[in-house]
């Protein structure tokens, strides 16, 4: 990948040749150079659009040569070869995250299948279909976000997440744990979401249809997120659908105003980014709810699987290098949060209550810190920065 060169401000007219004082006085009536003639203001008889386009073409034609532009710019420290190597490696890391994420759902799918074959439908009622539906909506939102950015590895991760979660939901519907109308509506949304994201990824989808889909997941995500957060503390606060209704109504109003052009450019961009951030916050809230449950019922910690938490930490950790490399703050926030809180945080709770050994916890902690250090070190080299702090600043505040 070629390094970018900082732009220089070009003069409106080409600079005259440099002469000594004597030569300039002797040739005072010197004829203008072809470049000067070419960039003279055009006749006012030509249309304004034609004059501006032609003038722009001539400015580009007689612009400073590349050597002059390069000489006035800052030196580029980035090594193209190392940049491309790290680009390819981070993409492979993101793709490899499919393995731990798929292993997270397979045990539940196999267990549900065994119970269904044995006729034990009651066992599937222990799996909350509303929670699975929430995760499915989060996967669809993130799938749309990464499909728009053409991040192949992340697209595959989210697609497998949608499919595996939908399989569990289908099993719950077969056990009559999930009502049939909700399952039919969910199936329609999943089919439409996968089809639209597939078409958009390959550039085969009209922009109008994609905007409608983005509006749908924005409103749906903003309606679900506050409701899930509210439901976490239901034993201590009254059970109510009001948070979801209010948030969904506000989201619908914001989307309509953005499409009607009633918002500023910054407001429109903010509304456009809501679906991705909503899905990220939704996944970020899940480990918070788990740790809140651990706090209320410490005895439940014995039922947690250390292997499951380790898979969650590894899967999210594998996506951190790619998020840092492309300077995607939303992706980095979600992956780092899940890796630390959902994975390492729950392992820390299990260690505090003697569910896992000290050696296992320390080895996991050391491995996670070593991985983060390796990520920042390689990213610093790839981008040609002087220190990892510079990479973090670019991630948080942009270049």
From Swiss-Prot:
- Name the Gene Ontology molecular function terms of this record: maltose transmembrane transporter activity
The compartments listed are:
Plastid, Chloroplast inner membrane
* Residue intervals passing through the bilayer: 93-113, 123-143, 154-174, 180-202, 217-237, 238-258, 268-288, 306-326, 361-381
Membrane topology label: Multi-pass membrane protein
What cellular-component terms does GO give this entry?
Answer: chloroplast envelope; chloroplast inner membrane
Give the source's domain of life in one word. Answer: Eukaryota
For this UniProt record, the keywords arranged alphabetically read as follows: Chloroplast, Maltose metabolism, Membrane, Plastid, Plastid inner membrane, Transit peptide, Transmembrane, Transmembrane helix, Transport
Quick one: where is this thing mainly located?
Answer: plastid
Outline where the chain's transit peptide begins and ends.
1-67
**GO annotation terms (biological process):** maltose metabolic process
Which PANTHER family does the UniProt entry name for this protein?
MALTOSE EXCESS PROTEIN 1, CHLOROPLASTIC-RELATED
Q: What does this protein do?
A: Probable maltose transporter. Essential for the conversion of starch to sucrose in leaves at night, probably via the export of maltose from the chloroplast.
Q: What is this protein called?
A: Maltose excess protein 1-like, chloroplastic
Q: What organism is recorded for this protein?
A: Oryza sativa subsp. japonica
